[in-house]
Amino acid sequence: MTAEDLPYRPCVGVMVLNRQGLVWAGHRLAVGNSEYDGSPQLWQMPQGGIDEGEDPLEAACRELYEETGIRSVSLLAEAPDWIHYDLPSHLIGIGLKGKYRGQRQRWYAFRFEGDESEIAINPPPGGHEPEFDAWEWKPMHELPGSIVPFKRRAYEEVVAAFSHLVR
C-alpha cells in the first residue's frame, strides 16, 4: 500500500487564543502504535474529523468541546484555505488507523471567553476518551516546534493564517 492509494481525512483544527494572545495546546497521549508513538514533540491544538454531512465550523466546535470541555469561545477567523499534511512513509497503513495518507484540515481561530475551570481534558466531557494528559497556553510562534515533525509545515501555515490575531 502506498500513500497514493489512500485519501486524505477531512478534518478541522482549532486555535484557541486567550485574552493575552497565547494559544491553548494539549500534550498528546501517545498510546500504542500511532502516529505519535516515539515523538518528543507532542503538543498540539485540538483537531478532529468532520462527520459525513457535518458543517466544518460545527465540527470545530464539537471537537473543541469533546477534547477540552471548552465552549466559551467566540469565532475570530477562518483560515483562507484548506491545510493538509502527509504521514511519513513509515506510518502509511499505521497512523490515522491505517485508512488515510494524511489530513486535509479547515482551521478556525477562537477567542477563549470563559474561565479556565471549564477546561477538562482527563477525562474530557461526554465520556470521550482523553487525548491529552496536560495543557498550557503557548506563544503562537512556538507551536510549529512543539508538534510532531510531519505536521510542522501545516502548523507553520496555521500560524501564518492567524498571526494577525496576536497583539
UniProtKB/Swiss-Prot annotation:
Enzyme Commission number, as recorded: 3.6.1.-
The protein's UniProt keywords, in alphabetical order, are: Hydrolase
Q: Which InterPro entries match?
A: Nudix_hydrolase, NUDIX_hydrolase-like_dom_sf, NUDIX_hydrolase_CS, NUDIX_hydrolase_dom, RppH
Top-level enzyme category? hydrolase
Record keyword Hydrolase present: yes
Please tell me which stretches of this chain the record labels as motif Nudix box. Answer: 48-69
GO BP terms: nucleoside phosphate metabolic process; ribose phosphate metabolic process
**Nudix hydrolase domain: from which residue to which, for each copy?**
7-160
At the top level, the lineage of the source is: Bacteria
What PANTHER family does the record point to? NUDIX HYDROLASE 26, CHLOROPLASTIC, UDP/ADP-SUGAR PYROPHOSPHATASE
Its recorded name reads RNA pyrophosphohydrolase
What organism is the protein native to? Rhizobium meliloti (strain 1021) (Ensifer meliloti)
